[in-house]
Protein backbone atom coordinates (compact mmCIF):
# COMPACT_ATOMS: atom_id res chain seq x y z
CA UNK A 1 0.00 0.00 0.00
CA UNK A 2 1.43 3.34 -1.06
CA UNK A 3 0.27 6.94 -0.84
CA UNK A 4 0.40 8.41 -4.35
CA UNK A 5 0.75 12.18 -4.35
CA UNK A 6 1.34 13.01 -8.01
CA UNK A 7 0.32 11.89 -11.48
CA UNK A 8 3.91 10.93 -12.28
CA UNK A 9 4.07 8.66 -9.20
CA UNK A 10 0.87 6.95 -10.34
CA UNK A 11 2.23 6.43 -13.87
CA UNK A 12 5.44 4.97 -12.47
CA UNK A 13 3.51 2.46 -10.34
CA UNK A 14 1.32 1.46 -13.29
CA UNK A 15 4.40 0.97 -15.48
CA UNK A 16 5.91 -1.32 -12.86
CA UNK A 17 2.62 -3.16 -12.27
CA UNK A 18 2.27 -4.01 -15.95
CA UNK A 19 6.00 -4.54 -16.44
CA UNK A 20 8.33 -6.35 -14.06
CA UNK A 21 5.73 -6.39 -11.27
CA UNK A 22 6.11 -6.00 -7.51
CA UNK A 23 7.76 -8.63 -5.29
CA UNK A 24 5.46 -10.22 -2.71
CA UNK A 25 8.23 -9.99 -0.15
CA UNK A 26 10.21 -6.78 0.31
CA UNK A 27 13.14 -7.43 2.67
CA UNK A 28 14.04 -3.74 2.89
CA UNK A 29 10.53 -2.73 3.92
CA UNK A 30 10.35 -5.66 6.36
CA UNK A 31 13.62 -4.54 7.94
CA UNK A 32 12.40 -0.93 8.27
CA UNK A 33 9.10 -2.07 9.80
CA UNK A 34 10.86 -4.36 12.28
CA UNK A 35 13.16 -1.51 13.31
CA UNK A 36 10.14 0.75 13.83
CA UNK A 37 8.53 -1.82 16.12
CA UNK A 38 11.82 -2.44 17.92
CA UNK A 39 12.21 1.31 18.55
CA UNK A 40 8.66 1.44 19.85
CA UNK A 41 9.02 -1.61 22.09
CA UNK A 42 12.14 -3.59 22.95
CA UNK A 43 9.94 -6.69 22.93
CA UNK A 44 10.46 -6.73 19.16
CA UNK A 45 14.07 -7.89 19.41
CA UNK A 46 13.33 -11.38 18.05
CA UNK A 47 11.38 -9.97 15.11
CA UNK A 48 14.23 -7.56 14.41
CA UNK A 49 16.76 -10.40 14.41
CA UNK A 50 14.59 -12.41 12.01
CA UNK A 51 14.25 -9.41 9.68
CA UNK A 52 18.03 -8.99 9.54
CA UNK A 53 18.48 -12.69 8.78
CA UNK A 54 15.83 -12.61 6.05
CA UNK A 55 17.36 -9.49 4.54
CA UNK A 56 20.59 -11.44 4.03
CA UNK A 57 18.96 -14.82 3.33
CA UNK A 58 15.44 -14.38 1.85
CA UNK A 59 13.06 -17.23 2.82
CA UNK A 60 12.50 -20.03 0.31
CA UNK A 61 8.83 -19.19 -0.18
CA UNK A 62 9.79 -15.91 -1.89
CA UNK A 63 10.72 -17.80 -5.06
CA UNK A 64 7.47 -19.77 -4.96
CA UNK A 65 5.22 -16.73 -4.43
CA UNK A 66 6.44 -14.91 -7.51
CA UNK A 67 5.41 -11.30 -8.14
CA UNK A 68 2.23 -9.25 -8.17
CA UNK A 69 1.88 -8.27 -11.83
CA UNK A 70 -0.78 -7.25 -14.34
CA UNK A 71 -3.01 -5.08 -12.17
CA UNK A 72 -3.06 -1.85 -10.15
CA UNK A 73 -5.76 -0.58 -7.78
CA UNK A 74 -6.24 3.05 -6.79
CA UNK A 75 -8.68 4.59 -4.33
CA UNK A 76 -9.19 8.05 -2.88
CA UNK A 77 -7.10 8.82 0.18
CA UNK A 78 -9.28 9.67 3.19
CA UNK A 79 -7.25 11.96 5.47
CA UNK A 80 -7.48 12.80 9.18
CA UNK A 81 -8.10 9.29 10.48
CA UNK A 82 -6.11 8.47 13.60
CA UNK A 83 -7.19 4.83 13.33
CA UNK A 84 -9.16 2.42 11.22
CA UNK A 85 -11.87 0.04 12.39
CA UNK A 86 -11.51 -3.67 11.64
CA UNK A 87 -14.74 -5.68 11.89
CA UNK A 88 -14.73 -9.45 11.37
CA UNK A 89 -17.95 -11.36 10.68
CA UNK A 90 -18.24 -15.13 11.06
CA UNK A 91 -21.58 -16.95 10.90
CA UNK A 92 -23.78 -14.17 12.26
CA UNK A 93 -21.33 -12.90 14.86
CA UNK A 94 -19.01 -9.89 14.65
CA UNK A 95 -16.03 -8.67 16.64
CA UNK A 96 -13.29 -6.17 16.00
CA UNK A 97 -10.56 -3.81 17.02
CA UNK A 98 -9.33 -0.29 16.33
CA UNK A 99 -5.88 -0.09 14.75
CA UNK A 100 -4.12 3.20 15.40
CA UNK A 101 -2.15 4.79 12.59
CA UNK A 102 1.62 4.38 12.73
CA UNK A 103 3.59 7.38 13.89
CA UNK A 104 4.71 9.43 10.89
CA UNK A 105 2.68 7.28 8.49
CA UNK A 106 -0.85 7.06 7.10
CA UNK A 107 -1.30 3.30 7.53
CA UNK A 108 -2.85 1.52 10.50
CA UNK A 109 -2.12 -2.03 9.37
CA UNK A 110 0.92 -3.37 11.18
CA UNK A 111 1.03 -0.56 13.74
CA UNK A 112 0.75 -2.95 16.69
CA UNK A 113 -1.33 -0.35 18.56
CA UNK A 114 -4.93 -1.43 19.20
CA UNK A 115 -8.09 -0.65 21.15
CA UNK A 116 -10.69 -3.31 21.92
CA UNK A 117 -13.30 -1.78 24.24
CA UNK A 118 -16.84 -1.57 22.89
CA UNK A 119 -17.10 2.19 23.44
CA UNK A 120 -14.42 2.79 20.80
CA UNK A 121 -16.62 1.42 18.01
CA UNK A 122 -19.13 3.17 15.79
CA UNK A 123 -21.78 0.47 15.45
CA UNK A 124 -22.69 1.69 11.98
CA UNK A 125 -19.57 -0.19 10.89
CA UNK A 126 -20.86 -3.36 12.52
CA UNK A 127 -24.26 -2.99 10.88
CA UNK A 128 -22.73 -2.43 7.43
CA UNK A 129 -20.43 -5.41 7.89
CA UNK A 130 -23.36 -7.70 8.70
CA UNK A 131 -25.39 -6.38 5.76
CA UNK A 132 -22.66 -6.91 3.17
CA UNK A 133 -21.69 -10.31 4.57
CA UNK A 134 -25.27 -11.49 4.15
CA UNK A 135 -25.69 -10.03 0.65
CA UNK A 136 -22.48 -11.66 -0.59
CA UNK A 137 -23.06 -14.93 1.33
CA UNK A 138 -19.59 -14.80 2.88
CA UNK A 139 -18.46 -17.26 5.54
CA UNK A 140 -15.59 -15.35 7.15
CA UNK A 141 -14.68 -11.80 6.23
CA UNK A 142 -12.83 -8.80 7.66
CA UNK A 143 -13.81 -5.21 6.81
CA UNK A 144 -11.58 -2.17 7.30
CA UNK A 145 -13.41 1.13 7.82
CA UNK A 146 -12.34 4.77 7.94
CA UNK A 147 -14.49 7.90 8.21
CA UNK A 148 -14.81 10.74 5.71
CA UNK A 149 -15.10 14.47 6.43
CA UNK A 150 -18.84 14.05 7.08
CA UNK A 151 -18.13 11.24 9.59
CA UNK A 152 -19.60 8.62 7.29
CA UNK A 153 -18.01 5.15 7.49
CA UNK A 154 -16.27 3.96 4.33
CA UNK A 155 -14.92 0.50 3.56
CA UNK A 156 -11.33 0.71 2.33
CA UNK A 157 -10.50 -3.00 2.29
CA UNK A 158 -12.12 -6.43 2.56
CA UNK A 159 -10.07 -9.49 3.54
CA UNK A 160 -10.84 -13.18 3.87
CA UNK A 161 -8.42 -13.82 6.74
CA UNK A 162 -6.91 -12.28 9.84
CA UNK A 163 -4.15 -12.91 12.36
CA UNK A 164 -6.05 -14.76 15.09
CA UNK A 165 -3.86 -13.97 18.16
CA UNK A 166 -4.39 -10.23 17.72
CA UNK A 167 -8.08 -10.65 18.53
CA UNK A 168 -7.73 -12.72 21.69
CA UNK A 169 -8.21 -9.61 23.91
CA UNK A 170 -11.61 -8.81 22.33
CA UNK A 171 -14.06 -8.50 25.25
CA UNK A 172 -17.13 -9.67 23.36
CA UNK A 173 -19.02 -9.76 20.08
CA UNK A 174 -22.18 -8.50 18.33
CA UNK A 175 -25.05 -10.39 16.73
CA UNK A 176 -26.95 -8.95 13.71
CA UNK A 177 -29.45 -7.17 15.97
CA UNK A 178 -26.40 -5.27 17.35
CA UNK A 179 -26.84 -6.91 20.73
CA UNK A 180 -23.51 -7.07 22.55
CA UNK A 181 -22.43 -10.38 24.08
CA UNK A 182 -19.81 -9.82 26.76
CA UNK A 183 -17.19 -12.45 27.44
CA UNK A 184 -14.55 -14.63 25.78
CA UNK A 185 -15.32 -16.49 22.56
CA UNK A 186 -13.68 -18.78 20.03
CA UNK A 187 -13.86 -17.51 16.42
CA UNK A 188 -11.95 -20.53 15.12
CA UNK A 189 -14.61 -22.73 16.70
CA UNK A 190 -17.27 -20.69 14.91
CA UNK A 191 -15.56 -21.48 11.60
CA UNK A 192 -15.53 -25.20 12.34
CA UNK A 193 -19.19 -25.13 13.41
CA UNK A 194 -20.13 -23.25 10.23
CA UNK A 195 -18.36 -25.74 7.96
CA UNK A 196 -20.03 -28.66 9.75
CA UNK A 197 -23.43 -26.97 9.51
CA UNK A 198 -23.07 -26.18 5.81
CA UNK A 199 -21.70 -29.64 5.02
CA UNK A 200 -24.61 -31.25 6.84
CA UNK A 201 -27.11 -29.08 4.97
CA UNK A 202 -25.51 -29.93 1.61
CA UNK A 203 -25.58 -33.63 2.49
CA UNK A 204 -29.26 -33.46 3.40
CA UNK A 205 -30.07 -31.75 0.09
CA UNK A 206 -28.28 -34.47 -1.89
CA UNK A 207 -30.08 -37.19 0.06
CA UNK A 208 -33.42 -35.69 -0.93
Predicted regions and their residues:
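Short, glycine/charged-enriched secondary-structure capping and boundary segments
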Residues: 4-5, 89, 171
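Short flexible/disordered coil segments
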Residues: 28-30, 54-65, 136-142, 156-163, ...
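Solvent-exposed, charged interface segments at domain starts and junctions
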Residues: 1-3, 59-85, 202-208
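Short hydrophobic/aromatic-rich motifs at helix boundaries and adjacent loops
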Residues: 43-46, 56-57, 99-103, 114-115
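Active-site nucleotide/adenylate-binding loops and adjacent lid/helix of ATP-dependent enzymes
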Residues: 1-71, 123-126
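Short acidic/polar alpha-helix capping motifs at helix-coil junctions
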Residues: 37-38, 46-50, 94-95, 106-110, ...
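Phosphate-binding core of ATP-grasp and ATP-grasp-like enzymes
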Residues: 17-25, 68-111, 127-141, 147-153, ...
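C-terminal active-site "lid" helix and adjoining low-complexity regulatory extension at the edge
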Residues: 114-120, 138, 147-208
